[in-house]
Amino acid sequence: AGVLYILWVIWVGNYWLLLGLPIVFDIYVSKKVNWAFWKKRHGKNHVVVEWLDALIFAVIAVSLINIFLFQNYRIPTPSMEKTLLVGDHLAVSKVAYGPRMPNTPLVFPFTQHTMPFTGGRVKSWSDLIHWKYNRLKGFGHVKNNDIVVFNFPAGDTVCLEQQAVSYYEILRERIETITAEDIRAGRPLKGKDEYYSVARQMIWNEYTVIYRPVDRRDNYVKRCVGIPGDTVLIKGGKLFINGHENTEYETQQTSYYVRTNGTRINPKAFERMGVSKSDQSLTISGSGYRLPLTRKNAETISGFANVTGIEADYRRPGEYIAAVFPHDPAYRWNEDNFGPLWIPKKGTTVKLDMTNINFYTSIIDIYEENDLEIRDTVIYINGKPADSYTFRMDYYWMMGDNRHDSADSRFWGFVPEDHIIGRPVRVWLSIDKEAQGLKKIRFNRFFKGAKR
């Protein structure tokens, strides 16, 4: 036990922990102190004490496993279908990229950020102790096309009454609303900063707004399509990395408009293709569907006797979508036509000006904790004028395999290295919420690999 403890201390890299070696020696050898003070060393303990002892041991053991080895993650949304399905429970390896030490070690066991049965309003962690980002040695690094679990970067600020929507999305929509109201009323338009301040104050008055540290932000799972130093480009729905078209996986989905002769497609056909009931969306006219389909399923449906046409639902180049990163009309991008955009790499320096500052605002101001201001088109970092910036962390570009039903980097930008949690390796349980009885359990997905 002592050797294992020393090896663990070397791995963690905090040699002050060697002061705990006498405790380990006493627990296993000398046994002078009753470290499990809640139970008697000799004689029979009450059954309640025995259960309490087992519970304490289980909580400590599972907590250590979650930090250093594996963590469970349940897929809540269809953003990775058909690679990973809603209801899949994943074993996420912490050693794949190296375990990340907690920022907030004082937390109620087995919770992410909220106490159970409180309606999402009571936080489960304390900020009395806050540790800086530290990642232990792992077996490798994040690679292109790895499936990765990470903390949601835009989840640093949350409106408790609207937790399913990003605070920054709420803020942008509020700015658009009050700007439109001024235009309709014929009032003089305000500056960008003034609209921001007004919208922010309205939101803080209307909602309960809180801050969450990195390790207490919601967990997401996506595919890492771009690593530090890569250039991402999307043209007509096709993804290019460094000028080369990226691999299209068999399980990757795109939304299609499927036209029929007025009759509906047999539900059994949808069931065979794995198209869930919630995805079977009829068009307004009722003469077709809008469906997320793999390329293979699209080819299958196109051969149905009552299908008269099928077309991928791609946006036009130049169609500006305000929700798409960097949320700047100067870059008329959308989820199907995006970039080129370079992914920041640790130690690299970029020139800053008013044409590109929106790409790096969150990095400089939030992720790397500087004070960023813009006054009269002059950029100030920590109170000093700045025309360049050197990145202190690596960044990644994450996208869902279900391209038209995924909130991912196309909408909120880069994922910092300190947000990376681990890599899913196995599906250990899969529950289909739309099925009944034993059919709810997808036995065919048990222990299915989830690496690629």
Question: Where do the language-model regions lie?
Answer:
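Extended hydrophobic leader/signal-anchor segments used for secretion and membrane insertion
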Residues: A1-R452
